[in-house]
């Protein structure tokens, strides 16, 4: 179940139920608020698309919070030619997987695999991990060329 004061795409409820029976808090903020949150929580002074904050296991508490940058949702959806709902679903999935303990920077592809599973099940566009890999590959090709 999702705890959110704003409206959000219905598909997020389906994704959440598919991945966990637990509750998750969802927040939408703008790029400036996200930059400040990223700076204060991670020491990185730039905006980002999604942050997730797992909570310690507390009875009757949400599993954690997912914070989505609504400005970047609009930008990425337009840039990648898909809907804002689809972009929001990708970011939500990515954040929820982090809350559930997945870590694409440390695992052996388990998070990428789970993200791909959700993408296929809910017919979503390319995942954040795959998009990041595409950018790194293009950068590598450009450096060699």
Curated annotation (Swiss-Prot):
Function: Single strand-specific metallo-endoribonuclease involved in late-stage 70S ribosome quality control and in maturation of the 3' terminus of the 16S rRNA.
Name of the protein in question: Endoribonuclease YbeY
Pfam families in the record: YbeY (PF02130)
GO cellular component, one term: cytoplasm
The EC number(s) this enzyme carries: 3.1.-.-
Keywords noted in UniProt: Cytoplasm, Endonuclease, Hydrolase, Metal-binding, Nuclease, Ribosome biogenesis, rRNA processing, Zinc
Compartment annotation: Cytoplasm
InterPro entries with a match to the protein in the record: MetalPrtase_cat_dom_sf_prd, YbeY, YbeY_CS
Molecular-function GO term, any one: zinc ion binding
Cofactor: Zn(2+)
Keyword Cytoplasm applies: yes
Family: Belongs to the endoribonuclease YbeY family.
Source species: Campylobacter concisus (strain 13826)
Top-level taxon of origin: Bacteria
One GO biological process term: rRNA processing
Cited PANTHER family: ENDORIBONUCLEASE YBEY, CHLOROPLASTIC
UniProt enzyme class: hydrolase
Primary localization class, coarse: cytoplasm
Cofactor annotation remark: Binds 1 zinc ion.
Gene3D superfamilies per the UniProt record, alphabetical: Metalloproteases ('zincins'), catalytic domain (3.40.390.30)
Residues that hold Zn(2+) according to the record: 94, 98, 104
């Amino acid at each position: 179940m999702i705890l959110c004061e704003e409206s959000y795409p219905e598909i997020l409820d389906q994704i959440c139920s598919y991945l966990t029976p637990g509750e998750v808090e969802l927040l939408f903020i703008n790029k400036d608020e996200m930059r400040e949150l990223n700076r204060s929580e991670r020491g990185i002074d730039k905006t980002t698309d999604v942050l997730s904050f797992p909570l310690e296991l507390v009875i009757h508490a949400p599993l954690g919070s997912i914070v989505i940058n609504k400005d970047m949702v609009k930008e990425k959806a337009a840039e990648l030619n898909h809907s804002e709902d689809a972009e929001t679903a990708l970011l939500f999935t990515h954040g929820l997987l982090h809350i559930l303990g997945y870590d694409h920077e440390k695992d052996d592809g388990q998070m990428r695999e789970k993200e791909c599973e959700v993408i296929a099940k809910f017919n979503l566009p390319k995942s954040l991990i795959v998009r990041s890999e595409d950018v790194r590959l293009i950068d590598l090709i450009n450096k060699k060329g």
